[in-house]
Amino acid sequence: MEMAYWVMVMMMVWITAPLSEGGKLNDVIRALAPDDVTPQFILRSLISRRRSDSDVREVPVCSWKICPP
């Protein structure tokens, strides 16, 4: 338990130290994530994992409780 406390304290110091040197919070937060993790990268990886259109079944759209056969 004591080890977890010190790990937490050191992480807080590691995150807040650049702020005391004049850094901006946004820059500190961005430095915590790897450079290749961007919204564009995440979107591309999600699209590449998506099944092809032939695998996706079309669900009939029902309007006014009348569904196509």
From Swiss-Prot:
Cystine connections: 62-67
Prodomain residues: 23-57
Residue(s) carrying D-tryptophan: 64
Tissues expressing the protein: Expressed by the venom duct.
Source taxon at top rank: Eukaryota
One GO cellular component, as annotated: extracellular region
Location relative to the cell: Secreted
Residues annotated with 4-hydroxyproline modification: 68-69
Signal peptide: 1-22
Keyword tags: D-amino acid, Disulfide bond, G-protein coupled receptor impairing toxin, Gamma-carboxyglutamic acid, Hydroxylation, Secreted, Signal, Toxin
Something else known: This peptide is an evolutionarily optimized stable analog of somatostatin. In addition, it adopts nearly identical conformations as in the somatostatin drug analog Octreotide. As this drug, it contains a D-Trp at the same position, whose synthesis is a common strategy used for enhancing the metabolic stability of compounds in drug design.
Domain topic, free-text comment: The cysteine framework is C-C.
Identification of the protein by name: Consomatin Be1
Species: Conus betulinus
